[in-house]
Amino acid sequence: MQNQRIRIRLKAFDYRLIDQSTLEIVNTAKRTGAKVLGPIPLPTRKERFTILVSPHVNKDARDQYEIRTHKRLIDIVQPTEKTVDALMRLDLAAGVDVQISLG
């Protein structure tokens, strides 16, 4: 796996879950002898929704909600076979979306 790079993108609504998962990935990669770049925090996406409270009148009465999507990027440079095996066996939280690409 010479001159390979593994890029891992993580997405989650809860920043604590994504930080915990990031720490697990980084520790696993370093323990198996790979060089790790990151974690790099990417911009947080904020979706805002405004909903009318009243079904008929009172246009001024509204509720506002927000969903924040936190993102992190990790690059693993010069991964070993042990690194790939350890990352495949890693058990992460259910609320974290993981995208892995080889480059």
Curated annotation (Swiss-Prot):
SMART domains: Ribosomal_S10. Gene3D superfamilies: Ribosomal protein S10 domain. GO terms for biological process: translation. Signal peptide: none annotated. The lineage of its organism: Bacteria, Pseudomonadati, Pseudomonadota, Gammaproteobacteria, Enterobacterales. It comes from Buchnera aphidicola subsp. Cinara cedri (strain Cc). Disulfide bonds: none annotated. Part of the 30S ribosomal subunit. It comes from the Bacteria. Belongs to the universal ribosomal protein uS10 family. Keywords: Ribonucleoprotein, Ribosomal protein. GO terms for molecular function: structural constituent of ribosome; tRNA binding. Involved in the binding of tRNA to the ribosomes. Transmembrane segments: none annotated. GO terms for cellular component: ribonucleoprotein complex; ribosome. This is Small ribosomal subunit protein uS10.
